[in-house]
Swiss-Prot record:
It holds the Pfam family QueC. Its EC number is 6.3.4.20. The keyword Ligase applies. This is 7-cyano-7-deazaguanine synthase 1. It is an enzyme of class 6 (ligase). The gene is queC1. Zn(2+) binds at C198, C208, C211, C214.
Length: 233
């Protein structure tokens, strides 16, 4: 019998954690581990501009000692509609008004749905996601209302939820600034040199230093008073 098919003991806590390979999700893995969870991480090869973040996710998962790291293949560039999945749309190098073109339609809904499925198989009741509503790019699926609504849906749409074994969607970074996230991660031993945040990093993980994600990351390290380990072009 595989570990996935076994019910955990009453004292064992399991969590599925969405791990992009970036700063925020790496911090969330460390937080869950510190809370005593056996951590199962999930990343997605969804047709994004580069694979550097997937390599980063593997490094982070290994460094933080997760139980299992799973990479799911999707083809969101078949849908397009985002600068991250459509090479004909340029990644902006300055903040704009409204929801930016780097928003990927329904991405967190899709990712959380697959994490929910794995959590049900694992008999895990907690799903962690590194969304943030303070220092963020304005994506609608990073807001607290979205997280709360998805949790309600998860408990309506699953066998476990119907049988009273409810799921919790945990977003521990929701109300933290980027500086606070970095400070928390450093306290928990996160090696941010392993992570990649840039929307258009090269294959080696070197960052452009110009996109919104790079800007938020650099400002966060500066505000935290911590040296930024990010390699740039």
């Amino acid at each position: 019998m595989t570990e996935q098919a076994q019910n955990p003991s009453s004292s064992e806590k399991r969590a599925v954690i969405l791990l992009s390979g970036g700063l925020d999700s790496a911090t969330v893995v460390a937080m869950a581990r510190a809370e005593g969870y056996r951590c199962y991480t999930m990343s997605f090869d969804y047709g994004q501009r580069h694979r550097a973040e997937l390599h980063a996710a593997e490094r982070v998962a290994r460094d933080l000692g997760v139980v299992e790291h799973k990479v799911i293949g999707l083809n969101l560039n078949g849908i397009g509609g985002s600068a991250l999945t459509d090479s004909t749309i340029e990644v902006p190098e300055a903040p704009g008004e409204g929801i930016p073109v780097t928003y990927v339609p329904a991405r967190n809904t899709v990712f959380l749905s697959l994490a929910l499925g794995w959590a049900e198989v694992l008999h895990a009741r907690d799903i962690f996601i590194g969304v943030n509503a303070v220092d963020y790019s304005g994506y609608p699926d990073c807001r607290p209302e979205f997280v709360e609504a998805f949790e309600r849906m998860a408990n309506l749409a699953t066998k476990a939820g119907v049988e009273g074994q409810g799921f919790r969607i945990q977003a521990p970074l929701q109300n933290l600034s980027k500086a606070e996230i970095i400070q928390a991660g450093v306290r928990l031993g996160v090696d941010y040199g392993l992570t990649v945040s840039c929307y258009q990093a090269d294959d080696s993980g070197h960052a452009c230093g110009k996109c919104d994600s790079c800007r938020l990351r650099a400002e966060g390290f500066k505000a935290a008073g911590i040296s930024d380990p990010t390699p740039y072009f």
